[in-house]
Amino acid sequence: MKRKNVWAAIALTMMAAVVAGCSKEVSNPDNNTEELHQEIIVNPVELPTSLELTRAELEMVKSSNEFAFNLFRTAQDEKESQILSPISITFALGMLNNGAAGETQQQINKVLGFADGGAEGINDFCYKMLEMAPTLDPLTKVMIANTIYMNEPYELMPDFILKANAFYHAESETRDFFDGETRDVINKWAADHTEQMIKEVLKEDEFNPLSVSYLLNAIYFKGNWAKKFDKAETRDEHFVNVLLEDETEVAMLTPQPMMHQRDKFDYCDTDDYQALRLPYGNGSFVMTVLLPKTDSRAVPKVPTAEVWEQLNQRMHSTLVDVKLPRFESDTDINLVPVMRKLGMVDAFSPYTADFSRFCVWSKARIYIDLMKQVAKIKLDEEGTEAAAVTVIGMKDGSAGVDGYPLFHANHPFLYVISEQKTGAVFFIGQFTGR
């Protein structure tokens, strides 16, 4: 029996609009990390911030959106609701990409949509977002943070540290991963930078004390609707799902708290979608909801970046009767198979990965062993709160699968007993299991 949820992709598309749509961004000339994370005082008469983008920067936004929709199309779950932050992945991978070289770096560039701009283009894009997104709307709270935890005795390349600090405002901390506290420290960092929405990004069985490092990005968004829903208007109504049993579609009606209002909104109608844009605060951030027309019960087809651009161009203000579920959704996803399908292959193998610009230890074969994201969204009559943390765990392939050489004598072998200083052989033998 296969269950389809119409909101599975819609919730993700919302996050793409909220987060990937943050192509407007924070000014922090003193590079003060604390200042980046302070909530800005509300000013009810503040007008939308004007963001002037060069042609190159507009191309960066387009490239980022291309990755966003490709990512969700590849990761889309046909049964469950889902929430992802493409831009959080871009931050985490973009930071790490400064330690990559050769084909590994080229694959990362291409997957993120920066085949032409390269690592420098990703750095510029992320810096622009980091600097500007938090200050676009004083009515909306946006926080972006990056960090790196290194395991002793590994050291980061000086040039990597320089770029991580300059473009991502990332600080690195070296710890003994066997101290029994590092996982808690990482999870606390995630919680602190998402207003406690993401309290555990690394589960106990996911944290490896033999890892070389963990790179993290956290993004947090909280915005009140410019036109709030009246709670008195919220009613439980039927929500249509489809059950597939023996190749037969059976409609299942489930009650959902449905918010309601009638007002003027940006809206467009195409052959494939009804699209509605709901603004937050002063209008600098919006949520765009895509409702499929061909089959209102099916998981929506994820649009391309080009279709997304066309939808935005066709939007027009009109009176709309809106019903939208009040809901919460969270996702904990392993990104390794997703990124492989998108074309980022070499980075996940100690035999093909080239992170020679990441770690000082020349003999190390650094590769990505873990890449995941935890994301959450809450949507109600007041507005939306959403957060995501992306973590990338690096391993040393030259030290064996678990950080040390593997010597499993599980087939015939020779043995020698000798005097240590001279090497004089006292006994020599073999063991064949018989």
Question: What kind of region is each of these model predictions?
Answer:
Residues 79, 119-293, 313-400:
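Non-catalytic, conformational "gating/processing" segments within enzyme and secreted inhibitor domains
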Residues 86-100, 213, 415-421, 425:
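Extended, hydrophobic/aromatic-rich amphipathic alpha-helical segments that build helical scaffolds
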Residues 102-108, 297-299, 331-333, 387, ...:
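Extracytoplasmic/secreted cell-surface and envelope-processing proteins
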Residues 292-316:
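Internal alpha/beta scaffold segment
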Residues 1-3:
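N-terminal secretory signal peptides that target proteins for export/translocation
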Residues 215, 274-290, 400-434:
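Extended hydrophobic
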Residues 5-7, 11-14, 20-177:
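Detector for small/aliphatic-rich hydrophobic stretches
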